[in-house]
């Protein structure tokens, strides 16, 4: 058979050889015929097409396929990565792909193509939620729904974005910034939630370089200056620890250094206000053992060797993160008196930690797939909940921005299961996350065995126990402190179902109680001038009865009405503008 004319270009030939070599290296027991047939189809279909950099276009899908190979995606996923642009950008049809590679590949290619057709996000997820950017909402909704149908679609899309970020230099400046911001706000958090950490940190560092070039350069130079010193310390720490583990009988153990990523250093400088020269924990070790019980043995030997730092130990083996991540984390004072972070895990745990949900497709049998399968099932359930709770794309985006892209806390149920919730969540958020019916009848909570107010913010590692009563009802006050959009929507839905008269009465009582708390007389509600001035601030409210009803339904905040009345009855001087700190990165 005559070779495709695309192979007249040495760069395309080199790309094909690179793919074949990597496939044989990582999958020596697999036949590469279908993979190379997909390569040939992609080369032929994209023949004559070039990237902005001048490279033959087919080098892009090849690089995407190589990233997917590294992520341990299955062979159909690799083929789909090679063909992910052919239906959209060439004359190749679905029928041709189906005839040669089967229905599974067609479904994957179509899934990625639909994402490509989606409208680009115009700004960050959080900004889009605040501005209610409909196009952003539609795009993100499409992306997450595609992900829930087949996670491999999202893995291919992440690989596609990673290669585009690696080759961003040929783009105009404004487009680079837009793509980098979108990557930082959407794709990096998605990679994190899928547990694909090696993709997450690369996306963050590449985005950081574009969005904050000055700070990127400064941190890169600072890291370079101290590199030799750190490498010497790292080598010595690895040698000392490996010798100790060997002497204790852990012979088949890897001890490797793990670099701190530039964006994580930048975050520490910005969020904690620590000058770079005072960041000492730039050294991190990873210990990889054969069996789970050896993780705990190794932990004991590490703590015997070096002094552990109090309060900085986490056990994600007995209580895995919801995305399936398992490892022991500890921080110790190393041989030179500087903090060293140590992570201890088995090889299988390491696969999951590095490759996230993609590891699920590398294993088809036994327990190794169970943790990953449960994580995928939980993710699909969350996406379904967001869709069911949201009446439109804007609400969906707001829910995802709050519940998915925000920082998370990990807490325990009484049975020891782990739930992830948005940072700042309360026992009420926890209750609704477990089950809506449980949230509706919650009357109290215990955290770590101690009774606490329902507005208490949960911390990592908290064990939460709920107190319920069958005849209990939710409170409108909960809307003032719940953090998750899921809990908020369920509480509002409960009050919307009540009849209008009851909601009107409930809303009026709630406002009167809040006015008393603020030291105002409830008669402020009957002052026509005050009420009319308050009404203009609330959309879709025609009269005071409407206002009471919407408060009773949970659609308007009790506090917002009371504060408006307070401003009219007892106006206060405007607050003084607050001054800025001295952190050199404050404006970023």
Each model region followed by its residue ranges:
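Short, contiguous pre-domain boundary segments
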Residues: 1-28
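Internal insertion modules embedded within essential enzymes
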Residues: 8, 13-15, 94, 102-105, ...
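Short, mixed-charge amphipathic alpha-helical segments
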Residues: 22-38, 93-105
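Structural motif
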Residues: 28-33, 54-58, 71-74, 100, ...
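Alpha-helical phosphate/pyrophosphate-handling elements in metalloenzyme active cores
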Residues: 35-37, 41, 46-83, 87-96, ...
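Short hydrophobic/aromatic beta-strand micro-patches
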Residues: 288-290
């Amino acid at each position: 058979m005559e070779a495709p004319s695309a192979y007249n270009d040495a760069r395309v030939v080199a790309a094909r050889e690179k793919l074949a070599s990597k496939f044989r290296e990582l999958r020596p027991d697999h036949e590469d015929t279908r993979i190379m047939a997909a390569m040939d189809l992609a080369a032929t279909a994209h023949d004559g097409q070039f990237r902005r950099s001048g490279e033959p276009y087919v080098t892009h899908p090849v690089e995407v396929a190589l990233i997917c190979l590294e992520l341990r995606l299955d062979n159909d996923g690799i083929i789909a990565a090679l063909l992910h642009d052919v239906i959209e950008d060439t004359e190749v049809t679905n029928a041709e792909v189906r005839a040669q590679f089967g229905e599974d590949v067609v479904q994957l290619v179509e899934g990625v193509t639909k994402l490509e057709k989606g409208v680009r996000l115009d700004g960050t997820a959080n900004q889009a939620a605040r501005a209610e950017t409909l196009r952003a909402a539609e795009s993100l909704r499409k992306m997450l729904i595609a992900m829930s149908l087949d996670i491999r679609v999202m893995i291919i899309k992440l690989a596609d974005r990673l290669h585009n970020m690696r080759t961003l230099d040929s783009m105009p400046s404004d487009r680079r910034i837009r793509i980098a911001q979108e990557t930082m706000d959407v794709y990096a958090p998605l990679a994190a939630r899928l547990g694909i950490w090696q993709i997450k940190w690369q996306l963050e560092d590449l985005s950081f370089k574009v969005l904050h070039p000055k700070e990127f350069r400064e941190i890169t130079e600072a890291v370079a200056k101290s590199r030799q010193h750190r490498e010497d310390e790292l080598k010595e720490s690895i040698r000392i620890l490996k010798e100790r583990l060997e002497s204790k009988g852990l012979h088949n153990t890897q001890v490797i250094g793990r670099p701190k990523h530039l964006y994580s250093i930048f975050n520490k400088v910005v969020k904690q206000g620590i000058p770079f020269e005072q960041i000492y924990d730039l050294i991190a070790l990873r210990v990889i053992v054969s069996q789970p019980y050896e993780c705990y043995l190794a932990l004991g030997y590490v703590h015997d060797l070096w002094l552990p730092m109090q309060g900085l130990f986490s056990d994600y083996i007995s209580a895995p993160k919801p995305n399936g991540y398992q490892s022991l984390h500890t921080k110790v004072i190393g041989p030179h008196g500087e903090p060293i972070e140590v992570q201890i895990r088995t090889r299988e745990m390491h696969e999951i930690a590095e490759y996230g949900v993609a590891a699920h497709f590398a294993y088809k049998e036994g327990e190794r797939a169970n943790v990953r399968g449960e994580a995928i099932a939980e993710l699909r359930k969350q996406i379904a909940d967001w869709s069911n709770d949201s009446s439109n794309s804007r609400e969906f985006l707001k829910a995802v921005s709050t519940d998915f892209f925000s920082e998370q806390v990990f807490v325990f149920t009484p049975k020891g299961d782990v739930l992830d919730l948005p940072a700042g969540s309360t026992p009420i958020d926890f209750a609704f996350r477990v089950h809506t019916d449980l949230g509706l009848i919650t009357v109290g909570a215990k955290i770590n065995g101690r009774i606490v107010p329902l507005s208490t913010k949960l911390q990592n590692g908290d064990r939460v126990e709920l107190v319920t009563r069958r005849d209990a009802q939710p409170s409108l006050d909960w809307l003032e402190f719940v953090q998750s959009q899921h809990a908020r929507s369920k509480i509002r839905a409960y009050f919307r179902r009540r009849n209008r008269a009851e909601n009107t009465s409930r809303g009026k009582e709630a406002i009167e109680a809040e006015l008393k708390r603020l030291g105002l007389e409830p008669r402020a509600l009957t002052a026509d001038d005050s009420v009319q001035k308050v009404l203009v601030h609330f959309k879709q409210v025609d009269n005071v009865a409407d206002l009471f009803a919407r408060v009773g339904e949970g659609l308007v905040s009790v506090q917002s009405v009371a504060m408006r009345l307070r401003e009219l009855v007892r106006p206060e001087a405007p607050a003084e503008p607050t001054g800025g700190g001295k952190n050199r990165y404050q404006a970023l």
